[in-house]
């Protein structure tokens, strides 16, 4: 029997100032319930970057994991696109 699926998100790194931690901004479009307009919503997640390989501006894929600290609930899966 398989446990629940883990959430996977793709976003941009907005901060890498902490050791082994990055802040990833994930954008999504949601439909307004009354006006039916698509609204862009941005949410920030702290993610575990074990090897400190990410820089600001990188597109990364993060996956939900067990709580690693007070705020960290995601870990880095891969760097989709490096910033130039």
Swiss-Prot record:
Protein keywords: Ribonucleoprotein, Ribosomal protein, RNA-binding, rRNA-binding
Classification via InterPro entries: NA-bd_OB-fold, Ribosomal_uS17, Ribosomal_uS17_bact/chlr, Ribosomal_uS17_CS
The organism's place on the tree of life at top rank: Bacteria
Family annotation (SUPFAM superfamilies): Nucleic acid-binding proteins
Pfam family, one: Ribosomal_S17
GO biological process: translation
Matching PROSITE patterns: RIBOSOMAL_S17
Molecular function GO terms recorded: rRNA binding; structural constituent of ribosome
Cellular component terms per the entry's GO annotation: cytosolic small ribosomal subunit
Functional note: One of the primary rRNA binding proteins, it binds specifically to the 5'-end of 16S ribosomal RNA.
Subunit structure: Part of the 30S ribosomal subunit.
PANTHER family in the cross-refs: 40S RIBOSOMAL PROTEIN S11 FAMILY MEMBER, SMALL RIBOSOMAL SUBUNIT PROTEIN US17M
Name of this protein: Small ribosomal subunit protein uS17
Species: Clostridioides difficile (strain 630)
Gene encoding the protein: rpsQ
């Amino acid at each position: 029997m398989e446990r629940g699926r883990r959430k996977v998100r793709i976003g941009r790194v907005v901060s890498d100032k902490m050791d082994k931690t990055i802040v990833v901004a994930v954008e999504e479009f949601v439909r307004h319930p009354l006006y039916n307009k698509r609204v862009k919503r941005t949410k920030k997640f702290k993610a575990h970057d074990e090897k400190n390989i990410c820089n600001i501006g990188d597109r990364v894929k993060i996956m939900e994991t067990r709580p690693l600290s007070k705020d960290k609930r995601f870990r880095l899966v891969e760097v989709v696109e490096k910033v130039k």
